[in-house]
Amino acid sequence: MNLHEYQAKQLFARYGLPAPVGYACTTPREAEEAASKIGAGPWVVKCQVHAGGRGKAGGVKVVKSKEEIRAFAENWLGKRLVTYQTDANGQPVNQILVEAATDIDKELYLGAVVDRSSRRVVFMASTEGGVEIEKVAEETPHLIHKVALDPLTGPMPYQGRELAFKLGLEGKLVQQFTKIFMGLATIFLERDLALIEINPLVITKQGDLICLDGKLGADGNALFRQPDLREMRDQSQEDPREAQAAQWELNYVALDGNIGCMVNGAGLAMGTMDIVKLHGGEPANFLDVGGGATKERVTEAFKIILSDDNVKAVLVNIFGGIVRCDLIADGIIGAVEEVGVNVPVVVRLEGNNAELGAKKLADSGLNIIAAKSLTDAAQQVVAAVEGK
């Protein structure tokens, strides 16, 4: 779950990290009033969306008058911002962040992720701030400096100083950087984050460090113990199908193809998408119904898949372990009858009571194609899409 920039900076303030004074606004009038609260300009106005590349798309602007602030807010509020990180529809702009402009002397980068290879939280710092860190890692990886946090000791001040020295910082900037490093690490660990990023972390012309931007990604599996973060969730920034799936504890990710996929188990779901592509098809989604594939969840899964107008056929791939395939077949039949599926449905059942499940599907009288194997299922669903 991602947070907006203004929400990230609210967290920074709670942990004593330096950031520009700013206010999130939902109307042009609020934006003008925010400028008055901040004081004399210039100001910076920023569209609040869960995507990078806002500046290049016109979603960030330095302004010198309240009239410019109002014009920016009127232009963007209620509209959609399209960046290189969004799809063609963009993300809705419901808030504008108005904050004091900062005199920038130099831009740095500081961020952290969970590194699965080392199984630790790893901090990354670079002198190449203001640029996508992925681009820096690809083109100039030697400019990224890393430290890993020991899970027993947590972050240590010497690690912050080590990164500061590698960035060429001196004097009070080393102390300021170390404080920011320790604060970010504390936020990361206490708030169960998967990602934290300040890009850019700037050195002002007055010789101080300021968190000019903030990006936070929370671990969705830990939100049950982070109620304040859970309340910050902005579902308008999420794919509505993904949000609906989450309510039913379905793992759904929208893709660009035309073959809907419903599978139990994440690994099997990825394998299913691979074999669909191997036979010339394009998956429309990743959908893992999990071990409790009840009729209700299967019905909801069908509704979510078919809400995508691009879907021309559905492939259901179920491995019956604890779950019996005949019960899954009952759920599929009931779901198809209730939802009114008007596209071909190919079902592959394997495992516990698979033969009985296949017989129920065959006897249902519905437009359900029972596949004999995963390869057969992939071939049949691709053929169905092609009208063969």
Curated annotation (Swiss-Prot):
Limits of the ATP-grasp domain: 9-244
Top-level taxon of the source organism: Bacteria
InterPro entries: ATP-grasp, ATP-grasp_succ-CoA_synth-type, ATP_grasp_subdomain_1, Succ-CoA_synthase_bsu_CS, SUCC_ACL_C, Succ_CoA_ligase-like_bsu, Succinyl-CoA_synth-like
Cofactor(s) listed in the protein's UniProt record: Mg(2+)
Reactions mediated catalytically: succinate + ATP + CoA = succinyl-CoA + ADP + phosphate; GTP + succinate + CoA = succinyl-CoA + GDP + phosphate
GO molecular function: ATP binding; magnesium ion binding; succinate-CoA ligase (ADP-forming) activity; succinate-CoA ligase (GDP-forming) activity
Binding site for substrate: N264, G321, I322, V323
EC class: ligase
Single GO cellular component term: succinate-CoA ligase complex
Transmembrane region(s): none
GO biological process, one term: succinyl-CoA metabolic process
Details of cofactor binding: Binds 1 Mg(2+) ion per subunit.
Enzyme Commission designation: 6.2.1.5
Keywords: ATP-binding, Ligase, Magnesium, Metal-binding, Nucleotide-binding, Tricarboxylic acid cycle
Keyword NAD carried by entry: no
UniProt record similarity statement: Belongs to the succinate/malate CoA ligase beta subunit family.
Functional summary from the UniProt entry: Succinyl-CoA synthetase functions in the citric acid cycle (TCA), coupling the hydrolysis of succinyl-CoA to the synthesis of either ATP or GTP and thus represents the only step of substrate-level phosphorylation in the TCA. The beta subunit provides nucleotide specificity of the enzyme and binds the substrate succinate, while the binding sites for coenzyme A and phosphate are found in the alpha subunit.
Entry protein name: Succinate--CoA ligase [ADP-forming] subunit beta
Organism: Salmonella dublin (strain CT_02021853)
Gene field: sucC
